[in-house]
A protein has these predicted regions:
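NAD(P)-dependent aldehyde/semialdehyde dehydrogenase
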Residues: 84, 97, 268-378
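N-terminal Rossmann-like NAD(P)+-binding subdomain of aldehyde/semialdehyde dehydrogenases
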Residues: 1-110, 137
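Rossmann-like NAD(P) dinucleotide-binding subdomain of oxidoreductase/dehydrogenase enzymes
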Residues: 90, 98-241, 272
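C-terminal core of ALDH-fold dehydrogenases
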Residues: 31, 335-425
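Flexible, glycine/charged-enriched surface loops at secondary-structure junctions
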Residues: 26-30, 95, 171-178, 253-260, ...
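ALDH superfamily catalytic-core signature
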Residues: 5, 125-129, 133-144, 159, ...
Length: 426
């Protein structure tokens, strides 16, 4: 760790700031978010200037196009981020809500309430929107947050954090509610992972390597957000046009995100009707197909298909989260084979089935243990905003505390309040 960084100095400041926020009203916290939303638009030019520098450096280093897309901001994206802050303002405040309660035989009034976590740490890759999402969700739920974004987005993140801190300070709250260790690079990330007692929970968001490092090395409790090796399975008898729309959307709408499809499984019955059309449209969109033998044989007979985009799939392809215009495609003989393939290779994020059969949909749902199952819908819907949670801080693929898109409620813990009239235990 750098001698210039004392992580517990940052966490102590965060804790002091969070104690004041924890006693604030919903209106006050919404006021902070409104100030942030406005500040993002007001400082748009400054943010874009910093982002342009990051994007130029990323391209010069040969970063993949999909990852550069995740990094890049423009005025429309900044306005969309600002608008998403307003959406979070409109969400119900979880702090203080009653989870359950009642009276005991001893006459005690017992209530379990939602309360803030405290200080949350976020370690994530080069996605500037996460800087804003993490900040506003933590603040709305009464938490402070310490951020470590990817080095490829350092100028953008530092500018965003400065804008957010200024907005918080303008309303009389401590700017230390949002801090960053980005100036210390990887030393900052390692310090966060060792800040047990200072950071209450650590949330990594990024690729498999980043998440594994945090999970294995952190002494701070971790909520694991998994990688997105997402599957789409096209069942026998599925609506061909709908299935084609779904795989095109799931793969190509935005390739550098964790809910993009990475593997397409096709029931053998659907090879004549579905697969040629799907391959034609996927390759027309520029998708490189990593195909098993049956898929390659089908592709060879599809007219006007760019055969240079078809290659033989390897074992690694079934395990890969591409985050690019690549898709692994396999023909299966049954839904059972599709389920077994997904069980073996899935990261536990999102799996989709295209089917006309209720029993097949139920079998798929019951036999796959992923955080989200989509039936006749794109994998791209596994998103906090799409599911009515507002902005999300990540998508958890673990089972403890939170699973799936993590919204406001998942950024709280609980407190038991026991009220009596001089009661003592017998």
């Amino acid at each position: 760790m750098s001698n210039d960084l004392d992580i517990f100095e940052l966490t102590d400041r965060a804790k002091r700031a969070q104690r004041a926020l924890a006693t604030s009203t919903t209106a006050q916290r919404n006021g902070i978010l409104l100030a942030i939303s406005r500040a993002l638009v007001d400082h748009c030019e400054q943010i874009l200037h910093a982002n342009a520098q990051d994007c130029q450096c990323a391209e010069e280093r040969g970063m993949a196009a999909g990852l550069v897309d995740r990094l890049r901001l423009d005025e429309a994206r900044i306005r969309a981020i600002s608008s998403a802050v307003l959406d979070v303002i409109a969400l119900e405040d979880p702090v203080g809500t009653v989870i359950r309660g009642g009276r005991t035989d001893d006459g005690l009034r017992v209530t379990q309430l939602r309360v803030p976590m405290g200080v949350i740490g976020m370690i994530y890759e080069a996605r500037p929107n996460v800087t804003v999402d993490a900040s506003i969700l933590c603040l709305k739920a009464g938490n402070a947050v310490i951020l470590r974004g990817g080095s490829a987005a350092q100028d953008t993140n530092e500018t965003l954090v400065a804008v957010i801190r200024e907005a918080i300070d303008s309303l009389g709250f401590s700017a230390d509610l949002v801090q960053t260790v980005d100036p210390w690079g990887r030393d900052g990330a390692r310090a966060m992972m060792r800040a047990r007692g200072g950071i209450d929970v650590l949330i990594p968001r990024g690729g498999e390597g980043l998440i594994r490092t945090v999970v294995e090395e952190s002494t701070v409790p971790v909520i694991e957000t998994g990688t997105g090796n997402c599957h789409v399975y096209v069942d026998s008898g599925a609506d061909v046009d709908a299935a084609v729309r779904i795989i095109i959307n799931a793969k190509t709408q935005r390739v550098g995100v964790c809910n993009a499809a990475e593997t397409l499984l096709v029931h053998r019955d659907m090879v004549p009707s579905f697969l040629p059309q799907a391959l034609a449209e996927l390759t027309r969109a520029g998708v490189r197909i990593h195909a098993d033998t049956a898929v390659r044989e089908c592709a060879a007979h599809v007219g006007n298909l760019d055969q240079s985009l078809i290659s033989e799939a390897t074992e690694d392809d079934w395990r890969t989260e591409y985050l690019s215009m690549d898709l692994a495609v396999k023909v299966v003989d049954s839904i059972e084979e599709a389920v077994e393939h997904i069980r073996r290779y899935s990261s536990g994020h999102t799996e989709a089935i295209c089917t006309a059969s209720i029993s097949a949909a139920n079998y798929f749902r019951s036999n796959i243990d992923s955080a989200a199952i989509a039936v006749n819908a794109s994998t791209r819907f596994t998103d906090g905003g799409q599911l009515g949670l507002g902005a999300e801080i990540g998508i958890s693929t673990q089972k403890l505390h939170a699973r799936g898109p993590m919204g406001l409620a998942e950024l709280t813990t609980s407190q038991w309040v026991i009220e009596g009239d001089g009661a003592v235990r017998k």
